[in-house]
């Protein structure tokens, strides 16, 4: 069984304010954290934005949400975006008002990370995992942290890591680096080889390598490619690895890209979600230091496509009732 069986539930309070009431598979209304826990989830992932215009996903929002997770006995994985909005391979916008020279930016990043971690510590909330950036394959805190300057990236990541290490959290969270396209070993190898050869960012600065692995953006995203990539990562660097974002659709009438050949027989349904998540979990489990799987935003029913060309990737009906697939976490 995987050590971390998780769900990103960042948007739950946004949905609740919009009137959503979550129900388990039997139609019984409960707070989402208890529905997740009774379905085998043991950790939640939460994204943190620095200063979003509406306050959603900021630090206060996240501390409120984390209290609920802890009350339900769930572990906590904090996913820093280091931006006021979405950060991913196409967007890594430095927060408004942050410094525009690398020395001051590195200090700002250290202090922001330190202060944020101390807020959790002071609230009595244990953080289990922290990712220092989200899908930073093309760098972070642009333009200074773009991949045309690997040394800057290494400096920034070192500063972020030590913001976690110097915090009052005890025990210390595991520190994760998170890239996209986990199936692509060439990408992972290119990125880590460059960043770790610079000097400032050292192997001792972090504990885990996280990857996103989605079926609907490339036919190359096969389970075999994921297995090969994760195995190579572990044999080269020896870190724990996890799939920290994945989805499977219940509806995908107009896919923009071809699905990988090895999952084309998996149906677009709750049963298909169960089958796919079990398959991905089996790959992670087969890797010597494969420790976890996290499903991305299964309860964000007002954004059901979850950014993809598939109509619905959630694990809930439009009225907020859990699908049978949510119980897959008992079996991975």
From Swiss-Prot:
Pfam families: Glyco_hydro_53. InterPro entries: Glyco_hydro_53, Glycoside_hydrolase_SF. Its EC number is 3.2.1.89. It catalyses: The enzyme specifically hydrolyzes (1->4)-beta-D-galactosidic linkages in type I arabinogalactans. GO terms for molecular function: arabinogalactan endo-1,4-beta-galactosidase activity; glucosidase activity; hydrolase activity, hydrolyzing O-glycosyl compounds; polysaccharide binding. Glycans are attached at residue 111. The active site is at 135 (proton donor), 245 (nucleophile). It comes from the Eukaryota. Keywords: Glycoprotein, Glycosidase, Hydrolase. PANTHER family: ARABINOGALACTAN ENDO-BETA-1,4-GALACTANASE A (PTHR34983:SF1). Belongs to the glycosyl hydrolase 53 family. Has a pH range of 6.5-9.5 with optimum of 8.5; and a temperature optimum of 65 degrees Celsius at pH 6.5. This is Arabinogalactan endo-beta-1,4-galactanase.
């Amino acid at each position: 069984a995987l050590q971390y069986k998780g769900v990103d539930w960042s948007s739950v309070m946004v949905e609740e304010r919009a009137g959503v009431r979550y129900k388990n598979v039997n139609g019984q209304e409960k707070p989402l954290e208890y529905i997740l826990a009774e379905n085998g989830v043991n950790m939640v992932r939460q994204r943190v934005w620095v200063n979003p215009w509406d306050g959603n996903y900021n630090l206060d929002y996240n501390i409120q949400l984390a209290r609920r997770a802890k009350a339900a006995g769930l572990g906590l994985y904090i996913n820093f975006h280091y931006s006021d909005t979405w950060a991913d391979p196409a967007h890594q916008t430095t927060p408004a008002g942050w410094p525009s020279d690398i020395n001051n930016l590195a200090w700002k990043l250290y202090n922001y990370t330190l202060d944020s971690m101390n807020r959790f510590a002071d609230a009595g909330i244990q953080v289990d995992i922290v990712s220092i950036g989200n899908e930073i394959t093309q760098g972070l805190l642009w333009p200074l942290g773009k991949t045309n300057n690997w040394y800057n990236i290494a400096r920034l990541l070192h500063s972020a890591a030590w913001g976690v290490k110097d915090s009052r959290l005890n025990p210390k969270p595991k520190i994760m680096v998170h890239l996209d396209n986990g199936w692509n070993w060439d990408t992972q190898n290119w990125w880590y080889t460059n960043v770790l050869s610079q000097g400032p960012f050292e192997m001792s600065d972090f504990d885990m390598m996280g990857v996103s692995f989605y079926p609907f953006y490339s036919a190359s995203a096969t389970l075999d490619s994921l297995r090969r990539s994760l195995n190579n990562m572990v044999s080269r660097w020896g870190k724990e690895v996890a799939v920290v974002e994945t989805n499977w659709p219940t509806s995908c009438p107009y896919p923009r890209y071809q699905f990988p050949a090895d999952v084309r027989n998996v149906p677009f349904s709750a049963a298909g979600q169960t089958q796919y998540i079990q398959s991905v979990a089996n790959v992670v489990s087969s890797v010597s230091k494969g420790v976890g799987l996290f499903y991305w935003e299964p309860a964000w029913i007002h954004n059901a496509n979850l950014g993809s060309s598939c109509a619905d990737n959630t694990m809930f009906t439009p009225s907020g009732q859990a699908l049978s697939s949510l119980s897959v976490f008992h079996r991975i």
